[in-house]
Amino acid sequence: MVRLIVIFLIIAIIAAIFGFGGVAEGAADIAKIIFYIFLVLLVISVLSRLFRK
């Protein structure tokens, strides 16, 4: 149990360093782009499924 606490503490510290250091901003921009790409792919998939029937 103590091992999990230490692991989560280390992960939290690393996340804080990335979050406060500005590294997360670049990752967030990439995540937004990927989100919109997959949203468009979802809409295309749903529409093609509807028109196929």
Curated annotation (Swiss-Prot):
GO CC annotation, single: plasma membrane
A Pfam family matched in the record: DUF1328
Topology class, membrane: Multi-pass membrane protein
Origin superkingdom: Bacteria
Keyword Transmembrane in record: yes
Keyword set, alphabetical order: Cell membrane, Membrane, Transmembrane, Transmembrane helix
Family designation: Belongs to the UPF0391 family.
Protein name per UniProt: UPF0391 membrane protein GFO_1615
Biological source species: Christiangramia forsetii (strain DSM 17595 / CGMCC 1.15422 / KT0803) (Gramella forsetii)
Taxonomy of the source species: Bacteria, Pseudomonadati, Bacteroidota, Flavobacteriia, Flavobacteriales
